[in-house]
Amino acid sequence: TYKNIPISVISTGIGCPSAAMVIQDLGKINCNYLIRVGTAGSCSAEIKPGDNVIGTGAVRDEGLTSKFLPLKYPAVSDIDVTNALLQASQKNSITVHKGIIHTSDAFNSPDLPADIETAKQAGIKAFEMEASAVMMIGALNNIKTGCILSIDGYVMNISEGNVKPDSKACAEGLSGAIQSALDSFLILNSNDS
């Protein structure tokens, strides 16, 4: 529990397939809310290591979700969960950015530099590996979902072979993301009362 509210913390592993399996099981036990807390790489040098990104939706650049619904169906987070994450982050004085994120199966693909350029032009905030499944499979199982990510570095550095994650900043950002997620559940619980 967190401040007398029952909360479960679950590791799904890496990628959409394992996340989807966990979410489908949560749907069977009447889970109401699900918030993905994790790490991501930013699409812009202005979004720095340790900053948090709240995903409002996700590009479905992975192989799992199209097995459930066609690509024309968007992966979006629940507005109430997103607003609770924003409110909690503001209360906790967390540096946060909100917007679309890019879920991908492969960060080291030859297409990465072009994908990053397109993402920057489209205002994509970050690249990660699970959010589209969390949002879509959650929606299919009547679970309201959200996503908050701590930035560990700039994605373009990966394609240039210059990976220099800022572990200290990312850990601080992740701590803030966890606190914001926990406080979001308090907000959502009070809204449901």
How should each PLM-predicted stretch be described?
Residues 132-169:
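Zn-dependent metallopeptidase/amidohydrolase metal-coordination segment
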Residues 32-33, 125, 144:
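Short acidic/polar active-site loop segments enriched in Thr and Asp
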Residues 84-92, 137, 180-188:
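Generic non-transmembrane alpha-helical segments
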Residues 157-193:
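His/Asp/Glu-rich mid-to-C-terminal helical/loop segments that flank catalytic regions of hydrolases
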Residues 72-122:
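Active-site rim beta-loop-alpha module in soluble metabolic enzymes
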Residues 1-83:
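Metabolite-binding pocket within alpha/beta catalytic cores that recognizes anionic/polar moieties
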Residues 17-20, 129-134:
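Short glycine/serine/threonine-rich phosphate/pyrophosphate-binding segments
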